[in-house]
UniProtKB/Swiss-Prot annotation:
Gene responsible for this protein: pepF
Protein name: Oligoendopeptidase F homolog
Lineage: Bacteria, Bacillati, Mycoplasmatota, Mycoplasmoidales, Mycoplasmoidaceae
Keyword Protease: yes
Family matches, as InterPro entries: OligopepF_N_dom (IPR013647), OligoPept_F_C (IPR042088), Pept_M3A_M3B_dom (IPR001567), Peptidase_M3B (IPR004438)
Cofactor binding, per record: Binds 1 zinc ion.
GO MF term set: metal ion binding; metalloendopeptidase activity
Species the sequence originates in: Mycoplasma genitalium (strain ATCC 33530 / DSM 19775 / NCTC 10195 / G37) (Mycoplasmoides genitalium)
């Protein structure tokens, strides 16, 4: 009998063993190498079509097999059979890739012929991906440079390896001591748990230790980050891009100026951010009955319900929340529940957090990993991840090649679902001031976390990269000064206030997390894109919630498009042009409306 709270990954193997699936991939790999024929497949249309067909088959088999392996590993990272299979697959894939080391150059060599082939309507689905390859031609390395880089490849990414050690194994995890009682700390999450303790003294003691976790290694972490940026800048210039940021903008099919435009729009949220922080502190001061609200007070969840929340309740609530999206959307959500797409429960060796799978070409099930914690926060996680999975379902139904959305707009579908939950709770809690305040405080927090905070991170990256381009090598003090100054532009703090705070060691410690953000090592300058997902997601949910049929129709066009269009063009399917100030202002106005509701509810709560 199936466990309804476990995902059923076995469907990915088509009722065959791991070994049989691996053998099938190896067989198709051999056929693909033979069809490639060292690039001769591009010399005539028939062999080109055969190569594409076998490549499609290989991709689909590989997606099924790797999704099975890596998700089984995340289910239990000590599964020896799975870990051995992953090792064998990685060895195979390295050899497979070697057989196609000349692929890009052969595509360039046969560009004119291939463009002629693509005029055939039967091959139109391959056009976007191949045109993106040709677009990148001026930025490809010469064969001599490529050969040299492959020889010295082991020297690369040392900064990231050092960072991974310094930010995990070498973390300064000190036990928290309060009133002679020691609270052992084995991971960063242990600090986070204590920061939610109802005892204020424990929270204060925890906060003082928590802000020191990167402090001991601050100089090494700073050096690691700067070396990482130096490498990224140098690689971008090797590929004929003026800078690392310009390279990533090119890859996203946008102008560099669009990133600055996003910064300008988010900077206009500063006054509202200040108003939110003031109101939030007033609420915490009232509820906690303290004279002054400290940072370690704001980590506490207000108005926590003691009721245990079940998976079955979460399922029913998710269906209610997403009902506005229509019968077909609900039908897919029910498929996710009934066909075991979701691995619900936490387990000892399981990956922490939540995600919806990617690389979905050839799949019919779009799996979700969760760690359900029996609280309503898991409902937010559930609708978020369902947003991703249903997005994958629609894209798979309408696209044969460009299915997985890019990170540029991938969060829109999940944020829209979170906002539909917010609007549902606005109605549900209209007579419950405590829960209404808690719901909206959480949502406004998310908004500023994804816009203001992430843009501060992005501005920090940009300003640091600028110093590197003018041959300066910033140290820890310079880095935290850069980061602190972003609070002037995006959070509305006065420059002199920030300058005075920077003189205090405690404040410097509280800023040291900026040198320990894994996203900065990703190599694609992407944290500003969280603001895009947040703003577009708000507008989608707001309009669908108000019964806007045009937005609903546009939304399903968006979900169905996958990655078949350039990122900004994909978002325009929603009727949203993010190169214009209007959508940014509209989202901002909606947040101001939420803030007004919180103020009104707080006044009633005080009576």
């Amino acid at each position: 009998m199936k466990n309804s709270y476990k995902w059923d990954l076995s469907v990915l193997l088509n009722n065959q063993s791991l070994q049989a699936n691996f053998l099938k991939i190896q067989t198709v790999s051999e056929a693909l190498i033979k069809a490639y024929n060292n690039g001769l497949c591009f010399t005539n249309k028939t062999s080109f079509e055969q190569f594409l067909a076998i490549d499609d088959k290989f991709t689909e088999l590989e997606n099924r097999y790797t999704n099975y392996l890596y998700n089984k590993q995340n289910e239990n990272n000590l599964d020896k059979e799975v870990n051995d299979a992953i090792f064998a697959y990685q060895s195979f894939k390295n050899n497979h890739n070697l057989a196609f080391s000349t692929l890009q150059q052969e595509l360039y060599n046969h560009e004119k012929l291939i463009k002629d082939y693509l005029t055939d309507p039967k091959l139109a689905v391959y056009k976007r991906n191949l045109m993106l390859v040709f677009r990148d031609k001026p930025h490809q390395l010469s064969s001599q440079t490529q050969s040299l880089l492959s020889q010295i490849n082991p020297c690369f990414n040392q900064a990231e390896r050092i960072f991974n050690i310094l930010s995990t194994a070498d973390l300064n995890l000190q036990p928290v001591v309060y009133q002679n009682k020691k609270y052992p700390i084995n991971s960063v999450s242990d600090y986070q748990s204590l920061l939610e303790n109802t005892n204020r003294g424990i929270r204060k003691a925890c906060y003082e230790k928590w802000i020191e976790i990167y402090w001991t290694n601050r100089n090494s972490l700073s050096l690691s980050l700067v070396e990482n940026y130096i490498q990224l800048e140098n690689f971008a210039k090797l590929k004929n891009h003026p800078s690392y940021i310009a390279q990533t903008a090119f890859n996203d099919e946008i102008e560099v100026g669009f990133i600055d435009f996003v910064y300008q729009q988010v900077a206009q949220f500063a006054k509202t951010f200040q108003a939110f922080i003031r109101l939030k502190k007033q609420i915490y001061k009232h509820v906690l009955k303290v004279n002054k609200v400290e940072p370690y007070d704001l980590t506490l969840t207000l108005f926590k319900t003691k009721k245990s929340y079940t998976i079955e309740q979460a399922k029913q609530d998710a269906l209610k929340v997403l009902d506005l999206l229509g019968d077909n959307y609900i039908k897919i959500v029910k498929k996710a529940f009934n066909e075991n797409w979701i691995d619900w429960l936490a387990d000892k060796n399981k990956y922490t957090g939540a995600y919806s799978i990617s690389n979905v070409k050839g799949l019919e099930h779009f799996f979700i990993l969760m760690n359900f914690d029996k609280t309503k926060s898991s409902l937010n996680t559930l609708v978020h991840e369902l947003g991703h999975s249903v997005h994958s379902w629609y894209a798979s139904q309408h696209q044969s090649q460009n299915i997985d959305p890019t990170i540029f707009y991938a969060e829109i579908a999940s944020i829209a679902n979170e906002l539909l939950l917010c609007y549902y709770e606005l109605q549900l809690y209209k007579n419950n001031h405590k829960q209404l305040i808690a719901s909206l405080l959480s949502q406004i927090n998310h908004f500023f976390g994804a816009t203001t905070r992430q843009i501060m991170f992005s501005q920090f990256e940009k300003d640091t990269l600028y110093l590197i381009r003018v041959n300066q090598k910033p140290d820890f003090k310079t880095l935290i000064k850069i980061y602190a100054n972003t609070a002037v532009k995006y959070q509305g703090f006065k420059p002199e206030v920030v300058a005075n705070k920077l003189k205090k060691t405690q404040y410097q410690k509280s800023l040291s997390h900026i040198i320990a953000i894994p996203h900065f090592y990703a190599g694609n300058f992407y944290v500003y894109k969280y603001a895009i997902g947040q703003v577009a997601g708000i507008l989608v949910a707001k309009k669908i919630n108000s019964g806007d049929k045009k937005m609903k129709d546009n939304y399903f066009k968006f979900l169905s498009s996958g990655s078949s269009l350039a990122p900004l063009e994909t978002i325009k399917l929603l009727g949203i042009d993010l190169t214009s100030p209007q959508p940014w202002q509209e989202a901002h106005n909606e947040v101001k409306r939420w803030l007004k509701i919180v103020k009104q509810s707080f006044k009633k709560l005080q009576k």
